[in-house]
From Swiss-Prot:
It comes from Bacillus subtilis (strain 168). Belongs to the glutamate 5-kinase family. The gene is proJ. GO terms for cellular component: cytosol. CDD domains: AAK_G5K_ProB, PUA_G5K. It catalyses: L-glutamate + ATP = L-glutamyl 5-phosphate + ADP. It comes from the Bacteria. Pfam families: AA_kinase (PF00696), PUA (PF01472). Coiled coil: none annotated. This is Glutamate 5-kinase 2. The lineage of its organism: Bacteria, Bacillati, Bacillota, Bacilli, Bacillales. GO terms for molecular function: ATP binding; glutamate 5-kinase activity; RNA binding.
Length: 371
């Protein structure tokens, strides 16, 4: 992988374990070190988006807890205190260098709704054009488990795709991806570069992670899958390594680089369908139609739909299934489940299709085969 001199927009994700002291509280020294590195990139002309964990870690002791709580209400209460404290610290440190930081708290529903998804992107672009440093975190105080991103690794990857970033840098307490767990296996070897996340690469992830954060190595690989599919480079390295950010964007850092080679990246619409939309139902397709959809050769017409499962509206994203029940793709439908199921409604659509050859159920431009 050679240095990319055209790189401009970088998303940096840092986890709780890289921001806290041995006692689990936010370390100002570590925050200062991170801010100094972000400032160095800003001074060099880069746009930087920071996805920062640490709200719960910053707040739980203020509630009288001795260690990080496990129950959701206690974690959310901790985050409600800690997020403000964390942003106050970031703002002061960036202002000392002449930069303004903004806070963006996101929930998964902000990404699953396409209108809100586009609105978040537009807001971030304005901030970046004005030289602001957006600091992003999941809105832990109001998010319930079933609607969470899971961890900030996933959030960072989706943010990178949202704003067409050139690179995602994930800073952790481990200096890259190994072929085993380096904490328990001294013979484990670091993998310098990954061009495809294969089952063998996934097997290397194990369950390595820290007790302070929520994201282990497996979640990081899932994040890099997203950015690689979106045509974005990735890097995983150790947060406390000297000048890690500057060296990472110049392809000179110690860690693991991720880059998809020889694949066509997903466009914005395809990214939203694949990673954010949240399918609402299923359509079982004929064998001939399934084959064409899998090969990206055709839109989905009425005669290719054999069965409908679930309820959905026109404009919803649904799963496209073959006759064996295997998911073969996702698509935005032009008709509701009611229109496609009720005899009178379906007859009306059939008559329309006989007149209008473009009366497709799902256009090829708004469908995505699952590989």
């Amino acid at each position: 992988m050679t240095p990319d001199t055209s790189m401009k927009r970088v998303v940096v994700k840092i986890g709780s374990s890289s921001l806290t002291s041995l006692h689990g509280e936010i370390s100002i020294r570590k925050l200062e070190a991170l801010v100094d590195q972000v400032v160095k990139l800003k001074d060099a002309g880069y746009e930087v988006i920071l996805v920062s964990s640490g709200a719960v870690a910053a707040g739980y002791r203020k509630l009288g807890f001795i260690q990080r709580p496990e129950k959701l209400p206690e974690k959310q209460a901790s985050a409600s205190i800690g997020q403000g404290l964390l942003m106050e610290a970031y703002s002061k440190l960036f202002l000392a260098h002449g930069y303004v930081a903004s806070q963006i708290l996101i929930t998964r529903s902000d990404f699953s709704d396409e209108y809100r998804y586009n609105n978040v992107r537009n807001t971030m672009n304005v901030l970046l054009e004005r030289g602001i440093i957006p600091i992003i975190n999941e809105n832990d105080t109001v998010t319930v488990n079933r609607l969470k991103f899971g961890d900030n690794d996933t959030l960072a990857a989706k943010v990178a795709g949202l704003i067409d970033a050139d690179m995602l840098v994930i800073l952790s307490d481990i200096d890259g991806l190994y072929d085993g767990n380096p904490r328990t296996n001294p013979e484990a070897k670091k993998i310098q570069r990954v061009s495809e996340i294969t089952p063998d690469i996934e097997a290397c992830a194990g369950d390595t992670g820290s007790i302070v954060g929520t994201g282990g190595m497996r979640s990081k690989l899932d994040a890099f899958k997203i950015v690689m599919a979106s045509g974005i480079k990735g890097f995983l390295g150790q947060a406390d390594a000297g000048d890690i950010l500057y060296h990472a964007v110049h392809e000179q850092a110690e860690g693991t680089y991720f880059e998809a080679e020889g694949t066509l990246p997903l466009n914005q619409k395809e990214q939203w369908i694949a990673f954010n939309s949240g399918p609402e139902g299923e359509m079982i397709l004929s064998d001939d139609c399934s084959r064409k959809i899998t090969n990206g050769q055709s839109s989905l017409y009425l005669d290719g739909v054999q069965k409908i499962k679930g309820k959905f509206k026109s404009g919803s994203v649904v799963r496209l299934m073959d006759s064996k029940g295997t998911e073969i793709g996702l698509g935005i439908v032009n008709y509701s489940s009611v229109q496609l199921q009720e005899p009178e409604k379906k007859k009306e659509l059939t008559n329309r299709a006989l007149i209008d050859q473009e009366a497709f159920v799902c256009h090829v431009d708004f469908s995505l085969p699952v590989n």
